[in-house]
Amino acid sequence: IDVVGIRLGIAILIDCKHWKRYNSSSLTSAVHKQIERTKQYVAKTEGSMAVPVIVTLYQDKIDFIDKVPIVPIFQFSSFIDEFYGNIDQMKTIGTD
């Protein structure tokens, strides 16, 4: 987890990838690792809810993998602006 941002009780856990070239399998692996890290964060943070996010340097054809958003850095600002309106499309991990 490279960046954690919390607003309105929801944590956004961001993993930044600086890869110039990547394939879908390496991105899928990164997503699964980020989901596991997010689960660990939630387990250690009482009453929390979190969304795993991958930020990349470059645009790709892939927008989501397993409901985890893949966000090119140049679209990050608009992603954050629209985050709460689109949260139902994203993987949210919370404590019961």
Task: Describe every region a protein language model picked out.
Residues 1-96:
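Intrinsically disordered, low-complexity Ser/Thr/Pro/Gly-rich regulatory segments
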